[in-house]
Regions:
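Glycine-rich flavin
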Residues: 2-5, 14, 22-28, 34-157
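Residues forming the Rossmann-fold NAD(P)(H) cofactor-binding site
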Residues: 17
């Protein structure tokens, strides 16, 4: 027996979250499916958030070293990379936790695994544990991200 929803959103990144929240605000019962096993999409886990967190940490260290007053307070000439990476991971954890609360607070059901359309209004989700869950729906939103197009005659490097 399939669990029924008004709408199902495939992808728990920024676009999927936005679509889910809009649908919930319209009074729809919504499920979100993501294959990563966590909300936030590539933006939170391998893209924008990690790179910006690393950049900000390095920027702050450089600023600290250049400030005459602050640089006398502590010696930060050598900060272990493990500490810099730990800071980035903390930022990611905070982002994921925040977005998880958005889904919970708005009663959006989360499914983690690979989604597959079985019929026009039925999706199966194969979980990492090997369990198949069936989800019936009226409307579907596919928000699985994109990749940049790279024309053959343009060097991206």
């Amino acid at each position: 027996m399939a669990t029924r929803y008004d709408a199902v959103v495939i992808g728990a990144g920024p676009a999927g979250e936005g679509a889910a929240m809009k649908l919930v605000k319209e009074g729809r019962r919504v499920a979100v499916i993501d294959q990563l096993g966590e909300v936030g999409g590539n933006c939170a886990h391998v893209g924008t958030i990690p790179s910006k967190a690393l950049r900000q940490t390095v920027y702050n260290l450089m600023r600290f070293r250049r400030d005459p007053l602050l640089s006398r307070m502590a010696d930060i000439r050598s900060v272990p990379l493990s500490q810099v990476l730990a800071r980035a991971h903390k930022v990611i954890e905070t982002q994921v936790s925040t977005h998880h609360r958005f889904f919970e607070r708005n009663d959006v059901d989360l499914y983690f695994g690979q989604a597959r359309f079985e019929e026009p209004n039925l999706i199966s989700v194969l979980t990492p544990e090997g369990i198949t869950e069936r989800i019936g729906f009226e409307h579907a939103v596919i928000a699985t991200g994109s990749r940049p197009y790279q024309p053959a005659d343009i060097d991206f490097n």
